[in-house]
Amino acid sequence: MPESLPVHVIDDDDAVRESLAFLLESSGLAVTQHTSAAAFLDAGVPLDRGCIVTDVRMPGISGLELLKELNARGAHMAVIVMTGHGDVPLAVEAMKLGAADFLEKPFDDAAIIAAVRASLGRSAEQGRQEDARSEVGKRIAGLSQRERQVLECLVNGLANKTIAYDLGISPRTVEVYRANVMTKMKAASLPELVRMALLAGVAPADDATPT
């Protein structure tokens, strides 16, 4: 559930940070406070799930610099940037760097809660996609070399006879390999198998022509 994902509030202003943390906690969210971007980065927080709410202007590492560092580390966290009046250009720059949203101070309580919940929802969905991609990748790794070749041919939309010709095996043997692939991939249908393969990055050839 999105509510179980962590929310990290980063602001050097104690009053703002504590007030925002209290507001989010009161709405049922799990919140951790950080007095600076450096403190957040030094905390060793997992960067694959959750949401960050950070001020754009902070001493040391600014909100924009934090976004750049998160990108460099391959983070998958939604980032909401808080800006002061007149900081819209900074907010636009933050969005270009991957921020999920920005809110101008003073912000409405309902608006910040809605923004955080929306970001957590996206983070949860992304997490599910990453988990699914990882699981499919493991299944593909369990295929034999020939089974992997048959899988790639199926993704390219090739018929059994064409696969047999391309691989130099009989159509009956292709059927056996195809059944093995379906079983190992735990796919209930060919469309599901293709979707799983595409999710894992098994891309069809540019010149592939279904036959």
Curated annotation (Swiss-Prot):
Pfam families: GerE, Response_reg. It comes from the Bacteria. It is found in: Cytoplasm. One of its GO terms (molecular function) is DNA binding. Phosphorylated by FixL. InterPro entries: CheY-like_superfamily, Sig_transdc_resp-reg_receiver, Tscrpt_reg_LuxR_C, WH-like_DNA-bd_sf. CDD domains: LuxR_C_like (cd06170), REC_FixJ (cd17537). Transmembrane segments: none annotated. GO terms for cellular component: cytoplasm. Binds 1 Mg(2+) ion per subunit. The modification 4-aspartylphosphate is found at D55. Its cofactor is Mg(2+). Keywords: Activator, Cytoplasm, DNA-binding, Magnesium, Metal-binding, Nitrogen fixation, Phosphoprotein, Transcription, Transcription regulation, Two-component regulatory system. Residues 160-179 bind DNA. PROSITE patterns: HTH_LUXR_1 (PS00622), HTH_LUXR_2 (PS50043), RESPONSE_REGULATORY (PS50110). Mg(2+) binds at D11, D12, D55, R57. Residues 6-120 form the Response regulatory domain. GO terms for biological process: nitrogen fixation; phosphorelay signal transduction system; regulation of DNA-templated transcription. Residues 136-201 form the HTH luxR-type domain. FixJ, when activated by FixL, induces the expression of both nifA, required for activation of classical nif and fix genes, and fixK, required for fixN activation. NCBIfam families: PRK09390.1. This is Transcriptional regulatory protein FixJ.
